[in-house]
């Protein structure tokens, strides 16, 4: 049994610290990406090209789709033939830690498609569960095997200084680690991520099918500084959820004892929903969660990704698109803040942060 990463002197850096690169996966799952994923592939391409201006992008793509991916991306990425069940690199990729000598360690969590037999979104996730270890092997990085502890990368945020941010709705959901107490889950996080403190937000984004991942509702933009998804519409179920999160954060301090500066990031003014026109594009396998017309999608500008030279922010053709860009431009004065049309990623069930995973420098 290997010592825990914490005992070995490793910790999880913040996303805004320097990257060696970013991991992504080419979107091909017919039950996630409608109409052969054509629109999604264009969106992924724009994201990859933007990230690649400042760091290496590793793209997992199976041999059958390699020539297609190359037709979009040419030599802008490093292609790796690693099989997957879907394209959520944030959730299936490794969480890569560093120590003070600059050595890296990849944490491999158990993945069960956001809830396994209890409320998972698809039943065959065998390949996804191997992505983290296979990618670490390709990078020749040592692996810390955290299995059978179930976790996705989108369920944790780190400030790089000992603080981990999570939601209770996700980490305490019955489909993850039902046999562990909250205290046991917290201790596992602290040991596996080399952290000092876990902050438990009550909620994420309304109807987020990941059981409300933290990366859709709140994110660190600097030490003791956060953005929080927000709405002033008291009739929207999101209002009470964000309000509860805000009240908790206002009382909390980070691992160093500092109070937080909190920036409210509005959610889109118009609700993003699945339309009748979207539905014929999906092809499901048995046991896979199906979309329905009018289904509210968990749209949030908080699902941005911080790359070395840019911050990539979802856009929804909404009046709040520019508001979100303006707020984040103030948070990241040294980076280009880039809006990316993101509805076609949202139709898959996540957004820009969900399809990216940073590899620290």
Swiss-Prot record:
**UniProt entry tagged with the keyword Hydrolase:** yes
Q: Which InterPro entries match?
A: Agmatine_deiminase, Peptidyl-Arg-deiminase_porph
The record's Gene3D superfamilies line, in alphabetical order, gives: L-arginine/glycine Amidinotransferase, Chain A
What does it catalyze?
agmatine + H2O = N-carbamoylputrescine + NH4(+)
SUPFAM superfamilies in alphabetical order: Pentein
Q: Which residues form the active site?
A: 354
Q: What GO terms in the biological process aspect are recorded for it?
A: putrescine biosynthetic process
Keyword annotations for this protein, in alphabetical order, are: Hydrolase
Which Enzyme Commission number(s) are on file for it?
3.5.3.12
- Keyword Cell inner membrane (UniProt): no
Example GO molecular function term?
A: protein-arginine deiminase activity
Q: Which family is it part of?
A: Belongs to the agmatine deiminase family.
Note the NCBIfam families from the entry. Answer: agmatine_aguA (TIGR03380), PRK13551.1 (NF010070)
Q: What is this protein called?
A: Putative agmatine deiminase
Q: Which gene encodes it?
A: aguA
